[in-house]
Amino acid sequence: MAQAPAHRAIVDASPWAGIFGTRIESARHYGRHWHATHGIGLVERGGHRSASGRGQVDAMAGDTIATNPGEVHDGRPLDATSRRWRMLYFEPGVLARWAGLQGVLELTRPAARDPVLARHLLRLFSRLDVWQASRTDLARLACDE
């Protein structure tokens, strides 16, 4: 029997209302699915290929990645190795409010080589890691419930 592809996913609560994070390292192929949130993230290692509402998207380590609420997409590694990425998911309306916009906000680049955005994401992930490390075991369990 074939061994299942390597996979590890962690969902992190956040101190920010309407936002949560994920850390994923996986060699799995994901079937078509969607999220009810905006997602903005960073590929940390390997490469990722997906079909999205904007066509085929390839993202390599250092690239930013994004999805819109309801956008159907899939995902798989670009080669036989796993890839690692982190995401921040924003409940609908959070990004628009931050940007001072009325109505719906759409992210138009599913993958990009954007060093400035990558640097800001790394800072946010770092702050989230510090916050996670400061939480008690009881607080972590309360979030998981």
Task: Give the predicted meaning of each segment.
Residues R8-E106:
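N-terminal regulatory/effector-sensing and dimerization cores
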Residues L101-E145:
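Amphipathic alpha-helical segments enriched in hydrophobic/aromatic residues interleaved with Lys/Arg
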